[in-house]
Amino acid sequence: LPDITLVSPVFTGDAGEQGSGGAGVTASPDIASFPSAPLSPHPPAFLAASRAHHADVGGMSPGSMPLSTELYQEGIIIPPLKLVDGGRRNDAVWELILRNVRTPWERDGDLAAQLAAHATGAARLAEIAGRYGLDETLRQARALLAYAESLTRAAIARIPDGIYRFEDALDDDGQGDSRRPDVPVPIRVAVDVRGEALTVDFAGTAPAVAGNLNAVPAIVESAVVYCLRCVALALLGELPMNQGVFAPLTVRIPRGSVLDPRPPHAVAAGNVETAQRVVDVVFGALAAALPDLIPAASQGTMNNLTFGGNRGQVPGSREDGMTHDPVSSPLAPDPWLLAPSFAYYETIGGGAGAGPAGDGASGVHVHMSNTRNTPVEALEYSYPIRVEAYALRHGSGGRGRHTGGDGLLRAIRFLSPATATITTERRRRGPYGLAGGEAGAPGRNALLRGSEVVPLPGKATLALEPGDIIWLETPGGGGWGEPG
């Protein structure tokens, strides 16, 4: 939380919190909290920080991944403030957050877990400093930074010098209207390799869009570093992750572009969708420099599905509609906290791109997703839904000497009224192939209502009735090499 000092000093044991795509973190659901560790009072030598994605922080649709057009629609905006003050939890701030979300008992527990993580991190740092002394601890920390920098420079030096360009696009501006013209949103990159230094320039990228696909610079830089680390791990076998990795790297992003919008542009999907396309263009550019290393494009989307509503009288639920006991909070036993609402957010895997070494993996999360499969049993136990189908989408991987991985089919039936939002990409153009390989199959979305099959665009918000089925087919990965 770089600007926490604009609010008040951070004292030992105090935690500041921030969650807002326009104020330093990636999107409103990604709440960051930064306490100081008790190692050195003025200023703190280390901070034990955490950032967690919360499944709902309010906003215009359950799951806080709406088809938004401005930041204010995406959930509560938390400026830098004290969540823990003088060693005590600030219950006024805590209550303000809980009253602005659909599932306050979940947020209560998740926020408490973040604070517990801080306490553990601070204790471990204090233990190290107590054992070795603060000066030696700082010396070793600086050595780790220098080691990561030297490895990063060594990896860059193994990439042939040159300027490598690539372009790909998002399907649309994120508004989700299938009647709108097919106007892709281009993302362009030039990767300039010079000795041990790397410059990644996104000049020529599209301006900020009306929808929520705008990404903040922190997202773009993280995606670039992810690509660089993948290359370094492949070339060198190791690369620790710390600020030293950034030292030989320069990232240039046009202000006002879809990769650096001005507030209050919407940014909810920048983290989950636009980041995937940033990875695709950076890898696409590096493929010209490292053709025997870089794979074809993976599915290029997280296939975000959020839904929520009120449980009501759902078979298997308790009389009050609750399936879980709320934890202790400043609101208990406030009826607001006990409201029988639910909100859920998941991402769905797809096909990985094939590469020079072999076929792509099928039915996996790729690149920036950072999530895992949700088990069907846990999902059906926790929410008023039934998973009707969950299978590989055979034949969706792009053909080539090596075939791209297959996407997935996931169909979910709703047992009670709900509001759902799908935020998906690669529905109009499939993931690219490389070295003559074919593109993977684009994804498809549909609503099944009775005997009717309603095709859906890549982005949509739906008012669902009991019995409705959301049907998602995720993209396959691109193929690599000329098909045999």
Predicted regions and their residues:
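Glycine/proline-enriched, intrinsically flexible loops and inter-domain linkers
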Residues: 1-14, 44-199, 203-312, 334-484
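Intrinsic disorder/low-complexity segments
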Residues: 14-43, 175-179, 310-339
